[in-house]
Swiss-Prot record:
Matches recorded under Gene3D superfamilies: Citrate Synthase, domain 1 (1.10.580.10), Cytochrome P450-Terp, domain 2 (1.10.230.10)
Annotated function: Component of the methylcitrate cycle that catalyzes the synthesis of (2S,3S)-2-methylcitrate from propionyl-CoA and oxaloacetate. Plays an important role in detoxification of propionyl-CoA, an inhibitor of both primary and secondary metabolism. Also has citrate synthase activity using as substrates acetyl-CoA and oxaloacetate.
Gene name for this UniProt entry: mcsA
One GO MF term: 2-methylcitrate synthase activity
Record protein name field: 2-methylcitrate synthase, mitochondrial
Assembly notes: Homodimer.
Native source organism of the sequence: Fusarium solani
Length: 472
């Protein structure tokens, strides 16, 4: 196992540590404002005091456990701490109290485009504060400077079978980055528990910086014949622009796609802590596994059909519908196709949510983005998604087997990638994996800063449940 072990380090010692990737741009951003680590350092004491106040109420109850919670995947249980976001069934997601629309208005934008930067969302998730544009320019540059991946990881990706699932490649590459983990090395040497957060922070920033590079290399190898990426990392550009450029969508002519990517990455970054990718990252991290191993676990959870594959399933279903109904379809044609899907025992993909009971604000944000751009609004596939969102809720209500008949974010994300020429649906989850690093990695830093313990819930067998509840 190539984990934290000294023997593993020796085994990999002969490999060159870093590729010497070329970077363009020379101008830095001088600022008297604190950088991200300094801002976080200032926030930690107050949060530790808050934890002490909460612990003073340790014997009080914040909920009850029903049999349906235990049998139903722990759904609805308040069982873990998650600082960055809170999901309300009726209001949707809030990031430190801010709605998506608030974030779109308040968070810094890129040098081009109008959408919030996902690295600004990370700053908000981690610190609870809205950064200045100058602070984010400095942070974007730091991410660009750390974007290169070790040479042995690049070679590993190059040697994978081209048809190996992108998420398998992604998880393995992220796990292998643990070879350079500052936290793992500091822990081996002995580290005060109060200081765990700092090398964890360093690892999280390093990983966040490298996620687009890994994902772009997977795309290049799997779908574009391998070889060098289409663009080098530009130190003057933001995280999303560089990801877009490495996917072959750099330059002024691709500004709309770059802005879509900013919005997509920011929207998908965090959605409370109970979803599989976030919880898996937290769970593995609670054992003091470093951020690379922890987020690799999150990526493997994200690869599951019930979690991160929904966007590709929606697109496939929409394209099948488009082929099955007339070119000049009516609302009745769409209605009939929806019923045929349900009557065949299948679900309508892209509708419903484990928590939400209203339309997903992330779906609305992406649809608003698309509707404001004529080239997308006129796309027949997008128009069909739009028509479905108007008709499907009533059909699902009549069907009566869903608590939330409204569209979720997956209804719109895949079709937008498809519009911009990304037709490789298996890859959509890898893009999700770049985004989802924002929330779980921010929380992982707080897990270490607050000294949260290893996760160890109590399990019970079915006989035990029955004995406990019979006669109640």
């Amino acid at each position: 196992m190539a984990l934290n072990l000294t023997t593993s380090r020796r085994a990999l010692g002969s490999l060159k540590p870093l590729t010497r990737a070329a970077f363009v741009g020379a101008r830095g951003y001088a600022t008297a404002e604190p950088d991200l680590k300094a801002t976080l350092r200032e926030a930690i004491p107050a949060k530790r005091e808050l934890l002490k106040k909460v612990k003073a109420h340790a014997n009080k109850t914040i909920g009850e456990v029903k049999v349906e919670n235990t049998l139903g995947g722990m759904r609805g249980l308040k069982a873990m701490v998650w600082e960055g976001s809170v999901l309300d069934a009726n209001e949707g997601i809030r990031f430190h109290g801010r709605t998506i629309k608030d974030c779109q208005k308040e968070l810094p934008k890129g040098k081009t485009g109008t959408e919030m930067l996902p690295e600004a969302m990370f700053w908000l998730l981690l610190t609870g504060q809205v950064p200045s544009t100058n602070q984010i320019r400095v942070f974007s540059r730091e991410l660009a400077e750390k974007a290169q991946i070790p040479e042995f990881v690049a070679k590993m990706l190059d040697n994978f079978p081209k048809d190996l699932h992108p998420m398998t490649q992604f998880a393995m590459a992220v796990s292998a980055l643990n070879y350079e983990s500052k936290f793992a090395k500091a822990y081996e040497q002995g580290l005060n528990k109060a200081d765990y957060w700092e090398p964890t922070f360093d690892d999280c920033i390093s990983l966040l910086a490298k996620l687009p590079t890994i994902a772009a290399k997977i795309y290049q190898n799997s779908y574009r014949g391998g070889g060098a990426l289409p663009a080098e990392v530009d130190l003057e550009q933001d995280w999303s622009y560089n990801f877009a450029a490495m996917l072959g969508k750099g330059g002024k002519e691709n500004e709309n796609f770059q802005d879509l990517l900013r919005l997509y990455l920011a929207l998908h970054g965090d959605h409370e802590g109970g979803n599989v990718s976030a919880h898996a990252t937290h769970l593995v991290g609670s054992a003091l596994s470093d951020p690379f191993l922890s987020y690799s676990a999150g990526l493997q959870g994200l690869a599951g059909p019930l979690h991160g594959l929904a966007a590709q399933e929606v697109l496939r279903w929409i394209l099948q519908m488009k082929e099955a109904i007339p070119a000049k379809y009516t609302e009745q044609d769409v209605n009939d196709y929806l019923w045929s899907t349900l009557n065949s025992g299948r679900v309508v993909p892209g509708y419903g949510h484990a928590v939400l009971r209203k339309p997903d604000p992330r779906f609305e944000a992406l649809m608003d983005y698309a509707a404001a751009r004529p080239e997308i609004a006129q796309d027949p596939v997008f128009q069909l998604v739009q028509k479905n969102s108007q008709i499907a809720p009533e059909v699902l209500k009549k069907h009566g087997k869903t608590k939330n008949p409204y569209p979720n974010v997956d209804s719109s994300s895949g079709v937008l990638f498809h519009h911009y020429g990304f037709h490789e649906t298996l890859y959509y989850t890898a893009t999700f994996g770049v985004s989802r690093g924002l929330g779980p990695l921010a929380q992982l830093v707080w897990d270490r800063a607050l000294g949260l313990p290893i996760e160890r819930p109590k399990s019970i067998n079915l006989e035990g449940i029955l004995k406990q509840v019979e006669g109640q």
